[in-house]
Amino acid sequence: MLEKIRSPKILFDILEIMIYKRKLNLIKYNKKIQKRLNIDHTSYNKFLIIKEMNEKYQLNIKGPEHNVLELENQNGTEIFEYINKIRFNNLTTLNLQWANIDNLTSLEKINLSKLRILNLNFNNISEINFIQAFKLGNLKELSLFGNNISDIKAFEDIKFENLEKLDLSRNKIKIINISQKVNFPKLKELNMSYNKLIDIGSFNQFIFGQLEKLWISGNEITDINVLEKLNLKELKELYLNSNKISDINVLGKINFKDLNKLDLTSNPINNYLCSDTIYKLGKDINRFYK
């Protein structure tokens, strides 16, 4: 069988799996059985083999500094059943995209303190309260694209000290029901496009320090005056397209020092009312109105 396989990558994976199966069988039938199995590095293929282990083994996966666990497009219940038997010491990336899960409460015992990237795209998540249970002080990227989230009030109780990218696009958020300040000192990209946003007045509860890209396109927003109250000095790209905005004069009052992309397409903008603003913005911005 191995002679017919030309791809070095596939061949390597198959050989690796065979070796791991051999190791597991040796341990399984050894009278002096080990209670803990240390595996130097984890990958998806090895994870599948690990599942064959007897339940009484406590697995300790020790990876390199940047330990990545990819479990995309799997059954959430089955994933949690086996992840909870594994002790992660240095997990920095966790990909649970298309995993058919609605929360992460089953993983509360897992050490995610070093996690930097968490991908939960395309699941059935409607509540984000579970995030509070994890110590995610080192998290840099949180992606919740394509879920059923309608309420983000839980952000009031979460400290995003190092978060740089937050993707909440294509959810069901209508109103930003936040009444307390939420600090995003290092956030550079915020994507809330293609939700059901009508009112973004509560955006003034967000404290941005380094925001460079903001997407709120594809909603039902009519009033964008709140943007004047935000710290957008570092903003480079602003996407407001596909909303119901008719008055954009507030944009002329904001000091967009580095803005080079402003998308206002597919909005019922009043050209006469906003002519001065359109002219002012058009002098310095590459793409602003069509």
Task: Describe each region flagged by the PLM.
Residues 1-75:
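Cullin-RING E3 adaptor/co-adaptor recruitment helices
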Residues 48, 69-71, 94, 102, ...:
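Structural signature of tandem-repeat unit edges
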Residues 60-96:
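Conserved small-residue-rich
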Residues 69-71, 94-96, 115-120, 139-144, ...:
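Conserved hydrophobic beta-strand positions in leucine-rich repeat
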Residues 83-87, 106-112, 129-137, 153-161, ...:
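A structural signal for leucine-rich repeat
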Residues 233, 237-242, 257-290:
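C-terminal capping region of solenoid repeat domains
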